């Protein structure tokens, strides 16, 4: 069994010789209602899922599976279609006002979005799409209807789940609504296949949503190994970013929201400097990312927290950056810090490791898969700032630790290439198509 594809139940029996001749779909309709793959990760609702969709679609296209991505238009200036890469088309769907709609308000626009998807399909002959792959629960509801209308299988990826998030909320975070829980439960029942990032996420689908284990496939996300690599090293990256060569640099990179817990990093730095004030002159704490959500989600809230903690002089807030510059931030850091309350996988953890930087993370969700505790980084139980401060102190006392662990981290990340992930996803597609056809034939003949 592939390192990337695991089934909680038994594998589907092999298809007939005729089915094996069509192992992959020719064309897939991907749905991403609430965030466009063209948006900058780290801003608003754009994050790891955006990277996931872009990379997966491009690698599927390279493996002769065309992908059309449907997403909601957020400005009237957008063309109806954009070619993201050869074989990958982004289709913008008008659904509600272009600006001012929060993600929480989008369920009211799902009817309009579905109408736009159907309009785009209407110009094609039946069979134009072989499969629907929806991302996040909002897209899952559109995918459910589209797959039924087109007579094709539905593959769905949750990315995050309401019940899991609600069980691990930060103190100042807002619970996911009951309507989302109901919606996710309906999608789990309707989908032909569910893709989970890790075995733990697959288990959560079964425990929390009563998913059929035989429908769940585990496919680890990948990392762009051409972009995220050690390259010319930490010193060169620090020189490009204007960072001191001898500094301890714990980096936070991602959306600024309670779920990601950037405040835990700031509180940990405050604890460290209270205990060891001599480190103040040689620590820099970059926070790279934009606002998302509410409460401490806004950078101003974090800036005020840094001031209250007495560490404003060592914290540097930076807006979201493109993937190439993000790779440089990873290379420059002593350690990437991810104190998240919930992560289905944690793409930035693999990206940082691929760039040669160890990770200090909360032991939640998929992070124990992404990070090898004690070898490529450190995992902390819970969110006590003092626990993170102790590890940061170890990095301060062991100057060769970033390089030593970073080398192991880069080697570890090599096993997470997107080509392998895309090939595994194509296997899931093939299994879904096989079972869907078999079910339809059985239903037709009684």
Curated annotation (Swiss-Prot):
Keywords: Glycosyltransferase, Magnesium, Metal-binding, Transferase. Mg(2+) binds at residues 330-331, 333, 357. Residues 1-21 are annotated as: Disordered. It is an enzyme of class 2 (transferase). The keyword Flavoprotein does not apply. The keyword Glycosyltransferase applies. GO terms for molecular function: acetylglucosaminyltransferase activity; D-inositol-3-phosphate glycosyltransferase activity; magnesium ion binding. NCBIfam families: mycothiol_MshA. This is D-inositol 3-phosphate glycosyltransferase. It comes from Streptomyces scabiei (strain 87.22). The lineage of its organism: Bacteria, Bacillati, Actinomycetota, Actinomycetes, Kitasatosporales.
